[in-house]
A protein has these predicted regions:
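Short, solvent-exposed S/T- and G/P-enriched segments that are highly enriched in secreted/extracellular
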Residues: 132-137
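Active-site-proximal substrate-binding groove within the catalytic cores of carbohydrate-active enzymes
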Residues: 1-126, 139-152
């Protein structure tokens, strides 16, 4: 995107080398995927950074046609840091983001986003099942970090 005397990279053009931490890199990949956007590699990632672009569980969201939405359209409030959406198979994806400079707890009551009952939770970044969730999801999120959970009906 350009204009007179200005150039701005499109939001889905990701240069991982410009981020200060792995937590920021995970957030930079996760947010466009949660919003249903593509991921475009626009730098020369090293072997470590390349792994962020090769997370098959996260890339499966895009292949499914997933498009999530923020819990509330409050750009600066904490509720804008919670994203969710449903996959074609009926499972859900919930993303908890932290824009703060320090670690913070992010929580969402599942019924408030239309999710009812008990679900198996899987952390898509670390490829681990996290047990059963119902009622509320709450997690300590590192500064500029995120947690992306896939919820599958029990």
């Amino acid at each position: 995107i350009s204009g007179r005397g200005k150039v701005r990279l499109d939001g889905d053009f990701i240069r991982l080398g410009s981020f200060a931490s792995d937590d920021e890199k995970r957030s930079a990949i996760s947010l466009p995927l949660m919003a249903g956007g593509p991921i475009a590699v626009t730098d020369y990632p090293n072997a470590h950074d390349l792994t962020f672009f090769q997370n098959e569980e996260l890339l499966a969201l895009q292949k499914d046609g997933f498009v999530g939405q923020p819990y509330k359209r409050d750009l600066w409030g904490i509720d804008g840091e919670i994203w969710y959406g449903q996959l074609k198979d009926g499972s859900w994806v919930v993303g908890l983001f932290n824009r703060d400079q320090s670690a913070a707890t992010r929580s969402v009551t599942l019924s408030q986003i239309g999710i009812h009952g008990s679900w198996k939770a899987r952390n898509l970044w670390i490829h681990e099942d996290e047990g059963t969730v119902s009622g509320t999801i709450s997690a300590e999120i590192p500064a500029h970090g995120c947690k992306i959970l896939k919820l599958t009906k029990l």
